[in-house]
């Protein structure tokens, strides 16, 4: 059971990395850096919360 949840966390993390890199490719202008950071935070923070929640179970 724990192994399956670790596998799902790993796949979620790789999906998040793909989303972040696609956002960064889409915004090549320097004034989009703030928007990029916001988008990265929106993607990464829920993932970290999910990892923390699963780790407590």
From Swiss-Prot:
Its topology with respect to the membrane? Single-pass membrane protein
Membrane spanning stretches: 34-54
Per UniProt, subcellular location reads as:
Membrane
Q: Output the Gene Ontology cellular-component terms.
A: membrane
Instruction: Please provide the record's keywords in A-Z order.
Output: Membrane, Transmembrane, Transmembrane helix
Where on the tree of life does the source sit, at the highest rank? Eukaryota
User: Know the name of this protein?
Assistant: Uncharacterized protein DDB_G0283503
Species annotation: Dictyostelium discoideum (Social amoeba)
The lineage, from the top, is:
Eukaryota, Amoebozoa, Evosea, Eumycetozoa, Dictyostelia
């Amino acid at each position: 059971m724990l192994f399956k949840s670790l596998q799902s966390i790993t796949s979620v993390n790789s999906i998040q990395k793909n989303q972040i890199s696609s956002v960064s490719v889409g915004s090549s202008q320097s004034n989009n850096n703030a928007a990029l950071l916001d988008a990265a935070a929106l993607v990464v923070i829920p993932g970290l919360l999910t990892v923390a929640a699963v780790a407590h179970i």
